[in-house]
Amino acid sequence: MSDLSKRDQHVLEAVVTDYIHTGEPVGSRTISKRYGVNVSSATIRNVMADLEEMGFLHQPHTSAGRIPTERGLRFYLDSIMQFKALEEREREMIREAFRNELPDVKELLRRTSRVLSRFCRQAGVVLWPKLTLTLFKRIEFIRLRAHQIMVLLVSKTGLVHHTLVEWEQDIGQEELDKYSRYLNDLLEDMPLGEVKQRVLEEMRDEKVLFDQLYSRALKITDRVFQQNLESSDVYIEGRTNLLNNPEFADVDRMRRILDAFEDKSRIIRLLDRTLRNSTGVQIILGTENDLQELNEISLISSPYRRGDTLLGVMGVIGPLRMDYSRIIPVVEFTADLLSQLLEEPGED
């Protein structure tokens, strides 16, 4: 990133701040009047011209003013912006939104997406936790009918994965209960991402090879883990908030945005990318996300956890012209609060 002088940074900050609040191109006189830049309008115009030449600002042909480019926004976010600390009143309002008792993890995550949407006035998104990132709590086998078994895989976090298994032999419920007890002892507290390998190792054990109970229990479990436990879902709340942004008033642009939200896999791919770097708030601007359908929006995201275990990611999607200094602290606080609330379900 280019080095900018203090004056250059001051002018860039003024342009970004004004553009975020108004959505309109910013002129030198506006900067001179509103932002206390103690130089003439002519000097400010020269600085803005230099910033445009360096790729930080852009001048729409219909206007004498300028707007920040993605590069300008990125420099502002990384080097200039100062967060607005949440007031205690705002923190309490967010806490209050979670105060009613929530029946399960699913409803807690859905509530989180609503809270983000409401407080940030954009789209709130929460990526459903990946089972493979959580710890094993128990497995249950339920005989539904001859040759058909329902397998319930439960994580320490309270997530439940259902799998229907068609089995060659008919197995009674009493024997299935023995399978559960054996596997619950074997796999206790193991990361679910490691269970498949542990089952394969156990299947090669000599004593297991000659024990029908152990062998059959492991084979059924192996079949469960051959399915895709990596699959994700995402809760999205407040799509219509995006349409209130003037950037999306254009019908074609609005249709592209709504189509992108309709296909959840695109949003999941965007959120999955942020899981690779699982510490703190991340911001992905426009074309940085590699998904052409989403290159007109920004994502502000933060991971959420249960204890030391990373579960997923949540955040806010909006236009490039979001009030980052206000929204980032909301996302950060809500992620911390969600992580605290997730300590409660799934305890032994």
From Swiss-Prot:
NCBIfam families per the UniProt record, alphabetical: hrcA
GO biological process, one term: negative regulation of DNA-templated transcription
Coiled coil: none
HAMAP family the record matches: HrcA
Name of the protein described by the UniProt record: Heat-inducible transcription repressor HrcA
Protein's UniProt keywords contain Transcription regulation: yes
Sequence similarity: Belongs to the HrcA family.
Annotated Pfam families: HrcA (PF01628)
Role description: Negative regulator of class I heat shock genes (grpE-dnaK-dnaJ and groELS operons). Prevents heat-shock induction of these operons.
Name of the gene this protein is made from: hrcA
Source organism per UniProt: Syntrophobacter fumaroxidans (strain DSM 10017 / MPOB)
Keywords: Repressor, Stress response, Transcription, Transcription regulation
